[in-house]
């Protein structure tokens, strides 16, 4: 059977393949289809999403090149589109790598030496995925396209590439660069582009790149972003992710058909000390009742209602003030130090402005940065992004902040709204490799005791326990929006003193009055 290999993958005549496989044809397509899991509280009228690891173009059905071994039993005769790649300048440059990074570089390099090589790197947040990828660029010496989700990450890549490989011509490809038609790999050695721009480019744009690096590869599951895979099949592809299979709906599994199973390295033991300050907040009755949609609690609407409580907003401001003025004299037996900076996480973008206004009244001489606000207004400037590296307080949404954004001087987090998913990535914002390990990491976690979302704290406890962070509990209310009476409820050095658990209490064991 004949097949072609092109940018779209392995192309086989649809009718011939169907005739060859007969009943197995339907089974093949089903195996290459990922169906989203229904989420708790999801309205019934919302269609269940499906994505396929095949695409139809005219008389041909295309599959990821990664699957070509599965077709060997059909004695395929491949006709591959010829690709001519220039070599990048070979200049001996050295930059330090940790042992685990060097081991992974060697493993990836071996895999990507073969034509159409694929590698999906799974490495925890803050452990140097970018540096590993840059080392691969240096070894392969192919024109490289780096695809990133946001401009903030694009700027970080440009900075790292310029620092570590100064002999290469590096450029950022964005909306402004789109107007420059000759901006290709012929003019530059490495181009770093944002997915929202690159996904619109025709397949000819990707032809000169011998290597494509997909940063935050797990995020390419969305219907629009996923289309990029059908344009880069001829290149070697390196996917990077800290959470490759972490989506509640399971849609990130579609990436595996293109990159293979995520490969994880042995990560170093975390050396950051820290603790959690868990505040049990009793909100005003007008704001704590659940919001239901189709007879099910809506987490989004419930959080929105919680943040209408002005006392809860003031509680976050008070905690920011406390962290900002924190000194080594605070009597915790693990010791504390004045934090370099504070990240305040919220669930929705509209809350950024609310908290910014509240914080600005208290911190008149303190630099507060909200990078997403500039993004929403039409693009964040490089100057604004550079300011985040010196800001005392940064406001972010969980969705924006969980990506691979690097703030090495940040050591404290305030979770202004409840959170269940992506907690390891969130904590990774203050535990990045290369940041000051002497600084104690502090997490302020607000538990809304009267809200149905309060049970999410048990999911967060599991992550805190994994990190080895002691948990101190205190209380606050809408009548008293500042925390007090701090009590140690979990000690990693003396687990027998547990006053909290990592699982919710069983309903059958609870006393009813």
Curated annotation (Swiss-Prot):
Keyword Glycosyltransferase in record: no
Residues spanning the signal sequence: none
Description of what induces expression: Expressed in the late phase of the viral replicative cycle.
Disulfide bond residue pairs: none
Enzyme Commission number(s) from the entry: 3.6.4.13
Top EC class of this enzyme: hydrolase
Tree of life domain: Viruses
Segments passing through the bilayer: none
GO molecular function, one term: ATP hydrolysis activity
SUPFAM superfamilies reported for this sequence: P-loop containing nucleoside triphosphate hydrolases
UniProt motif (DEAH box) ranges: 215-218
Binding site residues for ATP: 123-130
Protein name: Putative ATP-dependent RNA helicase QP509L
Lineage: Viruses, Varidnaviria, Bamfordvirae, Nucleocytoviricota, Pokkesviricetes
């Amino acid at each position: 059977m004949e097949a072609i290999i092109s940018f779209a993958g392995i192309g086989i005549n649809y009718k011939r393949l169907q005739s060859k496989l007969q009943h197995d044809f339907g089974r093949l397509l089903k195996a290459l289809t990922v169906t989203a899991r229904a989420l708790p509280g999801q309205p019934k009228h919302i269609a269940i999403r499906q994505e396929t690891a095949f695409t139809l173009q005219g008389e041909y059905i295309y599959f990821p090149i990664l699957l070509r071994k599965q077709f060997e039993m059909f004695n395929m005769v491949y006709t591959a589109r010829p690709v001519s790649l220039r070599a990048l300048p070979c200049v001996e440059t050295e930059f330090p790598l940790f042992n685990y990074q060097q081991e992974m570089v060697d493993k990836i390099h071996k895999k990507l030496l073969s034509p159409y090589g694929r590698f999906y790197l799974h490495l925890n947040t803050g452990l140097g995925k970018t540096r590993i990828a840059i080392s691969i660029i240096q070894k392969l010496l192919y024109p490289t396209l780096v695809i990133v989700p946001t401009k903030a990450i694009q700027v970080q890549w440009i900075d790292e590439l310029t620092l570590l490989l100064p002999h290469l011509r590096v450029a950022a490809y964005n909306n402004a660069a789109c107007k420059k038609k000759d901006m290709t790999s012929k003019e530059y050695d490495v181009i770093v582009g944002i997915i929202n721009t690159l996904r619109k480019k025709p397949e000819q744009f990707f032809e000169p790149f011998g290597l494509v690096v997909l940063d935050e590869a797990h995020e390419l599951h969305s219907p629009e972003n996923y289309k990029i895979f059908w344009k880069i099949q001829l290149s070697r592809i390196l996917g990077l992710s800290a959470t490759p299979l972490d989506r509640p709906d399971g849609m990130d599994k579609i990436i595996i058909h293109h990159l293979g199973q995520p490969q994880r390295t042995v990560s170093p033991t975390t050396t950051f000390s820290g603790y959690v300050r868990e505040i049990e907040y009793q909100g005003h009755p007008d704001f704590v009742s659940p919001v239901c949609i189709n007879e099910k609690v809506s987490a989004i609407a419930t959080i929105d209602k919680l943040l209408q409580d002005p006392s809860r907003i003031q509680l976050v401001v008070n905690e920011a003030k406390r962290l900002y003025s924190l000194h080594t004299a605070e009597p915790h037996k693990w010791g504390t130090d004045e934090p370099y900076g504070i990240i305040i996480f919220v669930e929705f973008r509209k809350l950024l402005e609310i908290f910014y206004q509240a914080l600005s009244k208290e911190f008149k001489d303190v630099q507060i940065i909200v990078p997403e606000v500039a993004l929403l207004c039409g693009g964040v400037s490089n100057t604004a992004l550079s300011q985040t590296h010196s800001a005392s307080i940064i406001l972010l949404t969980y969705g924006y902040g969980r990506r691979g954004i690097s703030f090495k001087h940040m050591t404290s987090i305030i979770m202004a709204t409840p959170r269940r998913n992506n907690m390891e990535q969130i904590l990774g914002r203050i535990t990045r490799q290369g940041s000051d390990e002497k600084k104690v990491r502090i997490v302020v976690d607000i538990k809304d005791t009267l809200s149905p979302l309060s049970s999410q704290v048990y999911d967060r406890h599991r992550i805190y326990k994994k990190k080895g962070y002691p948990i101190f509990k205190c209380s606050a209310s809408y009548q008293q929006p500042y925390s007090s009476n701090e009590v140690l409820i979990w000690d990693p050095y003396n687990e027998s003193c547990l006053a909290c658990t990592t699982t919710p209490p069983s309903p059958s064991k609870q006393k009813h009055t």
